[in-house]
Amino acid sequence: MASRILVNIKEEVTCPICLELLTEPLSLDCGHSFCQACITANHKESTLHQGERSCPLCRMSYPSENLRPNRHLANIVERLKEVMLSPEEGQKVDHCARHGEKLLLFCQQDGNVICWLCERSQEHRGHHTFLVEEVAEKYQGKLQVALEMMRQKQQDAEKLEADVREEQASWKIQIQNDKTNIMAEFKQLRDILDCEESKELQNLEKEEKNILKRLVQSESDMVLQTQSIRVLISDLERRLQGSVMELLQGVDDVIKRIEKVTLQKPKTFLNEKRRVFRAPDLKGMLQAFKELTEVQRYWAHVTLVPSHPSCTVISEDERQVRYQVPIHQPLVKVKYFYGVLGSLSITSGKHYWEVDVSNKRGWILGVCGSWKCNAKWNVLRPENYQPKNGYWVIGLRNTDNYSAFQDAVKYSDVQDGSRSVSSGPLIVPLFMTICPNRVGVFLDYEACTISFFNVTSNGFLIYKFSNCHFSYPVFPYFSPTTCELPMTLCSPSS
C-alpha cells in the first residue's frame, strides 16, 4: 500500500518532458509544472516553429513572465528522494503487505510476487509458483525487448506528430495563396462579381476549416499517443532500474498493455482530391450579366390562366402550377399532359418573365401562339412542340436532358421526289454547365426573337429563337409535364 502511494506521488512530481523528478520546478498559469531547463528549451522550440509559447501538455498559450517557481513541489521532490533512499522503505517492499512474510515466490497465474502464506491460501491454491530468482531473468529480457520496441515507437510517433504539424502549416500556406488568387481574379469586376467571390471564398474557408479541424484533432491524437507511450516507457524504466520486486509486481499486465500498443497514423489529405478553383470567364460573365440586366428592364406582370383542372393545379395567387394525377385514372397508362397559358396577350413590344423550376425532373416553357383547348400533347413524342405549330419552347426531360424544339426537318421522298415529307421535331440538345433553377424568357415581338436565360448562372444565354413569325397574339406557356413539383412565376423583387 505504501509503495503504491509512493508511486502515485512520484507520478505527480515527474516532469512531463524529461520524465524525471522535477528539478527547479516552474509552474504555468494552466497548472502544469516542468523542470526549469525543460520548459526553457521548449520555449525556444515553440517560438521557432509556431511563433508563440504554449504549454506542451494542454497547448494553452502564456507569457514568459508568468512562469513561477514552485517551492512546494520542490520540497515534495526532496522528501520523496529521502523516502525512496530509505532502507526501511525497501524493507517494506520486500515483505508481504498481508502476512508480513518475505516475498520469495512468483505466481504465474496472477503475475504477482507472493509469500509462502499467500501460496497456501485459497486465493492461490493450485496456481503455479516459482522462486523469484528463476523468473526474474526471463522477464528482464522481455521487458528489455519491450523497452527497445517502445523507444522505437516513440521515435515513430514523434515523427508522425512532426509530419502532421508540417502538413498543417503547408495547408495554411496553400489555402492562403488560394484566397489571394481568388480575390485577384475578382478585383476588376468587384461590383458585378461580389456574389461569386463571396461564394468561392466561403467554400474555400469551409474547406480550410474542415481540413485544419481534422488536422488539429489528428495532432491532438498524436500528442496523446506519444504521451501514453512515454508513460509506459517510464514504467518500464522504473521497473528495470528498481528492485526485483518492483520488476515483477504486475509484470504480466504491463506486458499485455505493451503488446496492445499500436501506433495510429494520422489522416492525411491529398492535393489531388482537393476542389480546385477555376477562374470564371470574367468577360463572358460581364457580357451575360449586362444582357440579363438589359432585358430585365422589360419585366412583365404575368399570371396563369386555369385550364384542364383534372391534370394541372394552379395556386390561389395564379403564379404557380403543378401536375396532378387525374382523379379518374384510365386503365391504360396516361401518356398525355396539358400546359397552361400566361395571362399576358402579346401583340407588340418587349416582354420578360422568369420561372422557378427548382428540383423538377421535367418541364417545358416558352411562348405559345395558338391554343387548342382539346389538344393533348404526347409526353413521349412532342410532335406539336414546333414553331410552325406556334410553340417556341425549351424543356427538361428525364431529369438531365435539356432541349430546344425546332421545326421538323423536311426531306424528299426517295420514291417520289416531288413529295416533301417531314420527320419529327428537331430536338436541339442544350448543354448546361450549371443547371438552371430559374429560367428567364425574353420576347422581342418586333425583332421576332425569343431568348432564354439561365438566371442561376449569371444570365448566360441558354437558347434563342430567331426569325419567328408572329401573325397573331402570343402568350407565355408553361407545362409542368408529369412531374408533380411546381413551376413558379417569379417577381422582380425575388
Curated annotation (Swiss-Prot):
Zn finger residue spans: B box-type: 91-132
Subcellular location(s) per record: Cytoplasm; Nucleus
Matching InterPro entries: B30.2/SPRY, B30.2/SPRY_sf, Butyrophylin_SPRY, ConA-like_dom_sf, SPRY_dom, TRIM/RBCC, Znf-RING_euk, Znf_B-box
RING-type ZnF: 15-59
Role according to the record: Capsid-specific restriction factor that prevents infection from non-host-adapted retroviruses. Blocks viral replication early in the life cycle, after viral entry but before reverse transcription. In addition to acting as a capsid-specific restriction factor, also acts as a pattern recognition receptor that activates innate immune signaling in response to the retroviral capsid lattice.
Any one GO BP annotation for this protein: innate immune response
GO CC terms in record: nucleus; P-body
Presence of the UniProt keyword Metal-binding in the record: yes
Catalytic activity, reaction form: S-ubiquitinyl-[E2 ubiquitin-conjugating enzyme]-L-cysteine + [acceptor protein]-L-lysine = [E2 ubiquitin-conjugating enzyme]-L-cysteine + N(6)-ubiquitinyl-[acceptor protein]-L-lysine
Residues binding Zn(2+), per UniProt: 96, 99, 118, 124
Family the entry assigns: Belongs to the TRIM/RBCC family.
Name recorded for this polypeptide: Tripartite motif-containing protein 5
PTM sites of type N-acetylalanine: 2
Residues annotated as domain B30.2/SPRY: 280-494
Lineage: Eukaryota, Metazoa, Chordata, Craniata, Vertebrata
Keywords of the record: Acetylation, Antiviral defense, Autophagy, Coiled coil, Cytoplasm, Immunity, Innate immunity, Metal-binding, Nucleus, Phosphoprotein, Transferase, Ubl conjugation, Ubl conjugation pathway, Zinc, Zinc-finger
Broad class of enzyme this protein falls into: transferase
Subunit description: Can form homodimers and homotrimers. In addition to lower-order dimerization, also exhibits a higher-order multimerization and both low- and high-order multimerizations are essential for its restriction activity. Interacts with BTBD1 and BTBD2. Interacts with PSMC4, PSMC5, PSMD7 and HSPA8/HSC70. Interacts (via B30.2/SPRY domain) with HSPA1A/B. Interacts with PSMC2, MAP3K7/TAK1, TAB2 and TAB3. Interacts with SQSTM1. Interacts with TRIM6 and TRIM34. Interacts with ULK1 (phosphorylated form), GABARAP, GABARAPL1, GABARAPL2, MAP1LC3A, MAP1LC3C and BECN1.
Domains as described in the record: The B box-type zinc finger domain and the coiled-coil domain contribute to the higher and low order multimerization respectively which is essential for restriction activity. The coiled coil domain is important for higher order multimerization by promoting the initial dimerization. The B30.2/SPRY domain acts as a capsid recognition domain. Polymorphisms in this domain explain the observed species-specific differences among orthologs.
Pathway field: Protein modification; protein ubiquitination
Protein's organism: Cebuella pygmaea (Pygmy marmoset)
Gene giving rise to this polypeptide: TRIM5
Domain of life: Eukaryota
